[in-house]
């Protein structure tokens, strides 16, 4: 098969159609012109704004102050698993195997 002529490209929805190989469609990525990229970058620089202020957090009607209210050491203690005071071992069981009669 020959490739389509360079001068005339058939486009669908502003881009060339997907190529079909082995029963599956393969999309071919084509780079866009560099002019539009530069224009978009200029627009992005004009519209950049500082990040919005963080909302204040209320806990039980009082403003939370972050780590000052809950120090990391207190949070670490709350997440630790308590240790058992008595070491419990499972009670020994006698195994009874069912055998057929003679």
UniProtKB/Swiss-Prot annotation:
It comes from the Eukaryota. InterPro entries: DAP1/DAPL1. Residues 92-102 have a biased composition (Polar residues). The modification Phosphoserine is found at residues 3, 49, 51, 91. GO terms for molecular function: ribosome binding. GO terms for biological process: apoptotic signaling pathway; autophagy; negative regulation of autophagy; ribosome hibernation. Residues 1-102 are annotated as: Disordered. Phosphorylated. Phosphorylation by MTOR inhibits the suppressive activity of DAP toward autophagy. Keywords: Acetylation, Apoptosis, Autophagy, Phosphoprotein, Translation regulation. The modification N6-acetyllysine is found at residue 29. The modification N-acetylserine is found at residue 2. The keyword rRNA processing does not apply. Pfam families: DAP. Residues 32-43 have a biased composition (Basic and acidic residues). Belongs to the DAP-DAPL1 family. Ribosome-binding protein involved in ribosome hibernation, a process during which ribosomes are stabilized in an inactive state and preserved from proteasomal degradation. Acts via its association with eiF5a (EIF5A and EIF5A2) at the polypeptide exit tunnel of the ribosome, preventing mRNA translation. Involved in ribosome hibernation in the mature oocyte by preventing mRNA translation, leading to ribosome inactivation. Ribosomes, which are produced in large quantities during oogenesis, are stored and translationally repressed in the oocyte and early embryo. Associates with ribosomes; inhibiting translation. Interacts with eiF5a (EIF5A and EIF5A2); inhibiting translation. This is Death-associated protein 1. It comes from Bos taurus. The lineage of its organism: Eukaryota, Metazoa, Chordata, Craniata, Vertebrata. The gene is DAP.
């Amino acid at each position: 098969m020959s490739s389509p002529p360079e001068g005339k490209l058939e486009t669908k929805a502003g881009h060339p159609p997907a190529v079909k190989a082995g029963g599956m469609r393969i999309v071919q990525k084509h780079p866009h012109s560099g002019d539009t990229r530069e224009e978009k970058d200029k627009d992005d620089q004009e519209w950049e704004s500082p990040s919005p202020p963080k909302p204040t957090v209320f806990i039980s009607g009082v403003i939370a102050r972050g780590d000052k209210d809950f120090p990391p050491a207190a949070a670490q203690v709350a997440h630790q698993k308590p240790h058992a005071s008595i070491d419990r071992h499972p009670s020994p069981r006698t195994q009874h195997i069912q055998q057929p009669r003679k």
